[in-house]
Amino acid sequence: MKNKVVVVTGVPGVGGTTVTQKAMDILSEEGLTYKMVNFGSAMFDVANEEGIASDRDQMRKLDPETQKRIQKMAGRKIAEMAKESPVAVDTHSTVKTPKGYLPGLPAWVLTELNPDIVIVVETDGDEILMRRLSDESRKRDLETTASIEEHQFMNRAAAMSYGVLTGATVKIVKNKNGLVDNAVEELISVLR
């Protein structure tokens, strides 16, 4: 039997991973344990097992056909995990590149993954900008509030298209500054 597959997305700096991890901890205490998987890590595991990448930086240098094959295999691997327990997939709905927005879950991944719910974690663009500026542990491209808002709009559009293709519901969870517990509770209500 397939358990729930939930995809959690958000722009860098929105706090999606933090909100998801806190929700997972609370649900685990209640006896509902999700397997949390980062899609990029799942891709790297596949590439590493095949001997074609020994570190994550090599992943970007693989040819597009190899990338697609690895994405598909990672999606299949995560879907297999859902036979054992519910799965929460931490990934990006879209990736901003110099040539435009790249779908984080192209059709060949969605077919394998077949999510039940797509969650988009958001907040105001200025809050994200301030979080990014204060996070010295990461090297992120400098963006404006308007470009962050555009990225969030593209994430919503992509999430809805994922829902159209799979029948998944789409939920927007707001992670406002100082109100992370509210975002966690909202996420938990969807994951139960």
UniProtKB/Swiss-Prot annotation:
Q: In the Enzyme Commission scheme, what number(s) does this protein have?
A: 2.7.4.3
**Which residues make up the binding site for ATP?**
G10, V11, P12, G13, V14, G15, G16, T17, T18
**Record's catalysed reaction(s):** AMP + ATP = 2 ADP
The record ties this protein, via Gene3D superfamilies, to: P-loop containing nucleotide triphosphate hydrolases
A Gene Ontology term for the protein's cellular component:
cytoplasm
Single Gene Ontology MF annotation: ATP binding
Subcellular location as annotated:
Cytoplasm
Give the keywords, sorted: ATP-binding, Cytoplasm, Kinase, Nucleotide-binding, Transferase
Going by the record, the broad EC class of this enzyme is transferase
What positions belong to coiled-coil segments? none
Q: Which InterPro entries match?
A: Adenylate_kinase_AdkA, P-loop_NTPase
Q: Does the record carry Ribonucleoprotein as a key word?
A: no
Q: What is its main location?
A: cytoplasm
Q: Which Pfam families match?
A: AAA_17
Q: Which family does it belong to?
A: Belongs to the archaeal adenylate kinase family.
Q: How does it assemble?
A: Monomer.
What protein am I looking at?
A: Adenylate kinase
Q: Which organism is it from?
A: Methanococcus maripaludis (strain C5 / ATCC BAA-1333)
List the lineage, top down.
Archaea, Methanobacteriati, Methanobacteriota, Methanomada group, Methanococci
The encoding gene is adkA
